[in-house]
Regions:
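Short acidic (Asp/Glu) patches
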Residues: 51-53, 84-90, 127-130
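Residues that form generic nucleotide/phosphate-binding pockets
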Residues: 58, 88, 208
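Extracellular-facing segments of soluble proteins and assemblies that are Gly/Ser/Thr-biased and enriched
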Residues: 68-108
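Extended, aromatic/histidine-rich regions of cofactor-dependent oxidoreductases associated
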Residues: 1-38, 43-44, 91-216
Length: 216
């Protein structure tokens, strides 16, 4: 990276933080510009909607972290602002003891799952600002997940619902993409890009997606 830090395994330094996504979602238009009342679902103390006022009562934080796309590019020092997922979880969601998995659903129909234990890290945010400006629809506004230790496909954009589950049973990666593209954890440091496929094979395949997956 430009600041001298080593890149994670298999990554190269990208030139800019661009809108990027799977083909079905990269150019999908999301109508909501203003605050969205999140739907809270599944194994929680009380399911329902989470208002902007509830989120606004949580401590706001600003953090600078790196973003790593599973297709092998990285961008250093992206400045995010929002609330910690751990604070949201303890104060608002209050998941039941058996909850172990969280599925994030986007307004664009995208969804992805992460283990609850990974989401409790101090740098996991529900973000609404990036680089000093409102998030905007290009980068997942009005609100998105930011989990710097995990590949970008886990960082769901345009959040509409947060669902707490016991396990991955009944969960599926969005059609038509195969489930093997969705690693159960997706940690960058361990290069958990996909299920079952070796990284020597998946790296060059994913690199081919880079020019095709940038928003037009």
């Amino acid at each position: 990276m430009a600041d001298g830090r080593a890149l994670p395994p298999g990554q190269f330094a990208g030139k800019a933080f661009v809108r990027f996504g799977l083909g079905r979602f990269r150019n999908k238009r999301v109508a909501h510009e203003g605050p969205v009342a999140l739907s809270l679902e599944g194994l929680v103390s009380e399911a329902g909607t989470v208002s902007a006022e509830q989120l606004g009562a949580l401590e706001r934080v600003r953090q600078v972290s790196d973003f790593h796309c599973v297709t092998t590019w990285s961008v250093a020092n992206v400045a995010w602002e929002g609330v910690r997922f751990a604070d949201f979880c303890r104060a608002i969601a209050r998941p039941l003891p058996e909850a172990a998995l969280v599925v994030f659903h986007g307004l664009d129909g995208y969804r992805c799952a992460m283990p609850l234990e990974d989401l409790m890290a101090h740098d996991v945010l529900l973000a609404d600002r990036v680089d000093g400006a409102p998030l905007g629809l290009a980068h997942g506004g009005p609100q998105r997940l930011v989990a710097p230790a995990h590949y970008g496909y886990k960082n769901v954009k345009h959040l509409a619902a947060i669902e707490f589950r016991k396990s991955r049973r009944g969960y599926s990666f969005p059609f038509p993409y195969p489930g093997l593209m969705d690693h159960p954890r997706g940690r960058v440091a361990l290069e958990e890009r996909a299920q079952f496929l070796p990284n020597w094979l998946i790296r060059p395949i994913y690199k081919l997606f880079v020019p095709r997956a940038v928003r037009k």
